[in-house]
């Protein structure tokens, strides 16, 4: 340990749109290749039931950086260009505690260059439609709000682009990366993170957020990693189809949120998605080697987390924003190679939320306790479960598919307020959510309990979810209007 530095360094590794079962250690088969992540999770503390309650980029990242639940942050769904006016943030807290704070990669805040408490940000938010609109301010356009794209143009010329192949930020279509691998955004984030290790102030601890924009589309892994899964993947027809899905007969567009695509397209999509994850894993190995070479490994606490998951065609759904496990369940683990935490519980099965990252990292690294809606997981790492949550409320504004849900250790209850429809899944017996039990009379009492509980949670919401103590159908325009407001 550096003699001038008493507190450990903290590295928060964030990936975008990686579902929990895309981490090999969370699977029962050997399809996904993530040896570096598996090593980190198995040597550290793996959270087997980690969730993103509002599963899309903007609300999930607000929860991560502020520790706030959606009712307080105002982020109940995805909406661009709503100002981030939060002052109590994870990087600001570390900064106040004497840390040098750095973010490399994706922020997805507004304004784009708002630092949220970081001393310095090297920004690449990925391919965002909103940044490519014709009426964007000069400094907020895609060409001028990405440090990665600036670097690409410096390396390859002013006409260089990474999206001229037609791949889209929300498409299930696949285009293996056409440039040499060193120009891939995943490599750039790791290269710049290694450069940060070189230029940091060695007299103070650092908090580094390495924020990858992958495996979020465009689905453009380097060809090596794409080919790996085209060879490994067999039958891809099992899409966890249950007794409740409605399949639209029309052929889905490349940007569709639902529908059934041909089996060969499904295979290419999965090969590219898993290929992007294995590529990240490969680059994380490179980064950990650098951390060790700088003699920082045993004085650094790492936390790996995804902002949300991806449906990947399950239940005929794509992308995220849904109340199902593909969207809301995420990989999360702590890697503590120096055994600084010295916990005793390596596999944690309790319900953990993305809001818990903020208070957990601060307490684990500094001993300081901060007040947020999230909770520090320290007690769980020592096998102390008293007072821990056994359920949580989640939601997402998504047009007619807008949802409210309650997840417990055993059950998931879902309400779609625009359609006024309900679902009930017995998660311990039906983890793939194939059998909707809402119509079975033996569960009527349980359903009524969930309805009453959800009505109490939503009683004061401006959308008008509750009338006379009962859940009531809500017009779509009531839900859309709330997305325009931040807190």
Q: Each predicted region: which residue ranges?
A:
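A short, conserved beta-to-alpha structural element at the edge of catalytic cores
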Residues: 331, 454-462
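Formylglycine-dependent sulfatase
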Residues: 1-412, 422, 431-452, 474, ...
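Short beta-strand micro-motifs enriched in acidic
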Residues: 414-416
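Short, polar/charged, Gly/Pro-enriched helix-capping and turn/loop motifs at alpha-helix termini
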Residues: 298, 371, 420, 461-468
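Residues forming the ATP-binding cleft of Hanks-type serine/threonine protein kinase domains
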Residues: 428
């Amino acid at each position: 340990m550096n003699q001038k530095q008493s507190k450990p360094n903290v590295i928060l590794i964030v990936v975008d749109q990686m579902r929990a079962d895309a981490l090999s250690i969370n699977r029962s088969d050997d399809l996904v290749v993530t040896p570096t992540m598996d090593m980190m999770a198995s040597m550290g503390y793996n959270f087997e039931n980690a969730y993103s309650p509002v599963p899309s980029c903007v609300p999930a990242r607000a929860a991560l950086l502020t520790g706030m639940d959606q009712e307080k942050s105002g982020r109940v769904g995805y909406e661009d260009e709503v100002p981030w006016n939060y002052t109590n943030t994870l990087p600001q807290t570390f900064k106040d505690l004497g840390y040098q704070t750095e973010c490399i990669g994706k922020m997805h805040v507004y304004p784009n260059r708002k630092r949220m408490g970081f001393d310095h940000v090297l920004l690449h938010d990925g391919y965002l439609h909103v940044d490519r609109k014709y009426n964007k301010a000069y400094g907020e356009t895609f060409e001028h709000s990405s440090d990665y794209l600036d670097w690409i143009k410096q390396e390859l010329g002013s006409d260089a682009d990474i999206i001229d192949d037609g791949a889209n930020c929300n498409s299930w279509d696949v285009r293996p990366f056409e440039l040499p691998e060193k120009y891939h955004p995943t490599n750039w984030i790791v290269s710049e993170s290694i450069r940060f290790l070189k230029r940091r102030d060695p007299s103070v601890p650092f908090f580094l957020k390495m924020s990858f924009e992958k495996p979020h589309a465009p689905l453009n892994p380097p060809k090596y990693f794409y080919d790996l899964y085209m060879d490994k993947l067999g039958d891809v027809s099992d899409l966890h189809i249950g007794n409740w899905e409605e399949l639209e007969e029309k052929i889905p567009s490349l940007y569709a949120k639902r529908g059934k695509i041909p089996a060969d397209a499904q295979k290419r999509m999965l090969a590219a998605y898993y290929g992007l994850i294995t590529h990240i894993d490969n680059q994380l190995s490179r980064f950990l080697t650098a951390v060790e070479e700088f003699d920082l490994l045993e004085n650094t606490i790492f936390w790996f987390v995804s902002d949300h998951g991806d449906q990947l065609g399950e239940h005929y759904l794509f992308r995220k924003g849904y109340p199902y496990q593909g969207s809301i369940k995420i990989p999360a683990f702590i890697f503590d190679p120096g055994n600084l935490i010295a916990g005793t519980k390596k596999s944690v099965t309790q319900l953990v939320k993305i809001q818990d990252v903020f208070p957990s990292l601060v307490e684990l690294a500094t001993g300081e306790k901060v007040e947020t809606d999230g909770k520090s997981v320290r007690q769980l790492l020592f096998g102390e479960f008293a007072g821990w949550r056994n359920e949580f409320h989640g939601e997402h504004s998504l047009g007619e598919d807008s949802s409210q849900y309650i997840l417990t250790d055993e059950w998931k209850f879902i309400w779609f307020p625009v359609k006024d429809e309900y679902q009930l899944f017995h998660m311990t017996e039906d983890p793939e959510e194939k059998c909707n039990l809402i119509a079975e009379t033996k569960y009527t009492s349980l359903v009524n309990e969930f309805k009453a509980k959800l009505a109490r949670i939503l009683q004061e919401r401006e959308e008008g979810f509750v009338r006379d103590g009962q859940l009531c159908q809500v017009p779509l325009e009531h839900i859309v209007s709330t997305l325009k407001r931040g807190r």
